[in-house]
């Protein structure tokens, strides 16, 4: 059974009742604690809010609302989402959000039990990261029309994402001060507010310099760019605002079509996968790759070794006389 489309999910969300004030307050307290105690990124907090609002609206105040939900109610909600064709990975993330929320309720004495304790996460199929070929990457990066300020910005963004292996949330929220062109490095604040230094590479540094020298001043009309969360964004639109993840997603799809690549096979995260896969194919060390990607666990990085192994097997089958 295939996962539901974004349009189908929006339609289902519109059919649910509005959020109750008590549930909204409980959700906001949870998010405020995460931000204050763990420094969770804004995009992650937005995802948690959507997860909790979905459950709260589905329950519509039954049995004490969101904070009063029991194991049976949570099981019914997960079953409803499964029948509504939400992807297993989406349901797994929801359960992770619920575990955090009810752990806080338990800690604060709002309730005396954890209704998620005996809930099993959905089984996730093991899927290998999908990487573009190096020739496809070349075509994709060359797709923007660099004769325009927006096209030059897009070229710089694509080059940087592939050169540094950034997450899309890291790219669109990147502050201008994170770039050090003189030293050729980028300071990235990743998940859990962990910082890492990533080399830029000659190509991405070249396009960043061109963007900063010509395109960005034109887009900002040579006015000061407003700060967001206390920092001035590096990449901006014609209204001097940072791009959203959805905007960049649309740009990647559009340029994939220009490059002659099926847009359905390309995503911003695919550039990060390509970065990792191509480095391994060219002999990069797994520990070094872990540091560049900002993975807290080496096991997360090791999945790329399977992709690299597949690449070697394909080369062997294609070129060895007895392959």
UniProtKB/Swiss-Prot annotation:
> Where is this chain primarily localised?
cytoplasm
The chain positions of domain Tyr recombinase read 127-317
A Pfam family per the record:
Phage_integrase
Q: What does this protein do?
A: Site-specific tyrosine recombinase, which acts by catalyzing the cutting and rejoining of the recombining DNA molecules. The XerC-XerD complex is essential to convert dimers of the bacterial chromosome into monomers to permit their segregation at cell division. It also contributes to the segregational stability of plasmids.
Subcellular localization(s) per the UniProt record: Cytoplasm
Gene name, Swiss-Prot/TrEMBL = xerD
Subunit structure of this chain's protein: Forms a cyclic heterotetrameric complex composed of two molecules of XerC and two molecules of XerD.
- Protein name in UniProt: Tyrosine recombinase XerD
Catalytic center residues: 167, 191, 269, 272, 295, 304 (o-(3'-phospho-dna)-tyrosine intermediate)
Q: Does the keyword Disulfide bond apply?
A: no
InterPro entries per record = CB, DNA_brk_join_enz, Integrase-like_cat_sf, Integrase_catalytic, Integrase_recombinase_N, Integrase_SAM-like_N, Recomb_XerD, Tyrosine_recombinase_XerC/XerD
Which lineage? Bacteria, Pseudomonadati, Pseudomonadota, Gammaproteobacteria, Lysobacterales
Any one GO MF term held by the record is: DNA binding
GO BP annotations listed: cell division; chromosome segregation; DNA recombination; DNA transposition; resolution of DNA recombination intermediates
- Name the SUPFAM superfamilies on file: DNA breaking-rejoining enzymes, lambda integrase-like, N-terminal domain
What the record says about family reads: Belongs to the 'phage' integrase family. XerD subfamily.
Recorded GO cellular component terms are:
cytoplasm; Holliday junction resolvase complex
The answer to whether keyword Cell cycle applies is yes
Keyword field: Cell cycle, Cell division, Chromosome partition, Cytoplasm, DNA integration, DNA recombination, DNA-binding
Species the sequence originates in: Xanthomonas campestris pv. campestris (strain ATCC 33913 / DSM 3586 / NCPPB 528 / LMG 568 / P 25)
Annotated ranges, domain Core-binding (CB)? 21-106
């Amino acid at each position: 059974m295939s996962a539901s489309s974004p349009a189908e999910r929006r339609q289902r969300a519109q059919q649910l009742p509005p959020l109750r004030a008590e549930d909204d307050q409980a959700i906001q307290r949870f998010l405020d604690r995460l931000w204050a105690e763990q420094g969770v990124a804004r995009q992650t907090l937005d995802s948690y809010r959507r997860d909790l609002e979905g459950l709260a609206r589905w329950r519509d105040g039954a049995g004490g609302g969101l904070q009063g939900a029991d194991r049976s109610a949570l099981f019914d909600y997960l079953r409803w989402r499964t029948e509504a064709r939400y992807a297993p990975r989406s349901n797994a993330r929801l359960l992770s959000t619920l575990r955090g929320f009810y752990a806080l309720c338990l800690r604060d004495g709002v309730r005396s039990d954890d209704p998620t304790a005996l809930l099993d996460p959905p089984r996730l199929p093991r899927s290998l990261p999908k990487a573009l070929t190096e020739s496809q990457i070349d075509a994709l990066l060359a797709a923007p029309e660099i004769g325009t300020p927006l096209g030059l910005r897009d070229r710089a963004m694509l080059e940087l994402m592939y050169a540094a292996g950034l997450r899309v949330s890291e790219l669109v929220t990147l502050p201008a001060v994170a770039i050090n062109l003189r030293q050729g490095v980028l300071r990235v604040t990743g998940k859990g507010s962990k910082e890492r230094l990533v080399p830029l590479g000659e190509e991405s540094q070249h396009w960043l310099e061109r963007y900063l020298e010509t395109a960005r001043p034109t887009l900002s009309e040579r006015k000061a760019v407003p700060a967001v969360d206390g920092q001035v964004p590096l990449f901006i639109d014609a209204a001097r605002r940072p791009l959203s993840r959805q905007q960049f997603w649309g740009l990647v799809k559009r340029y994939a079509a220009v490059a002659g690549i099926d847009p359905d096979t390309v995503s911003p995260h695919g550039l990060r996968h390509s970065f990792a896969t191509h480095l391994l194919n060219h002999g990069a060390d797994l520990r070094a790759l872990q540091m560049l990607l900002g993975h807290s666990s080496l096991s997360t990085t090791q999945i790329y070794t399977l992709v690299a192994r597949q690449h070697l097997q394909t080369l062997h089958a294609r070129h060895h006389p007895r392959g």
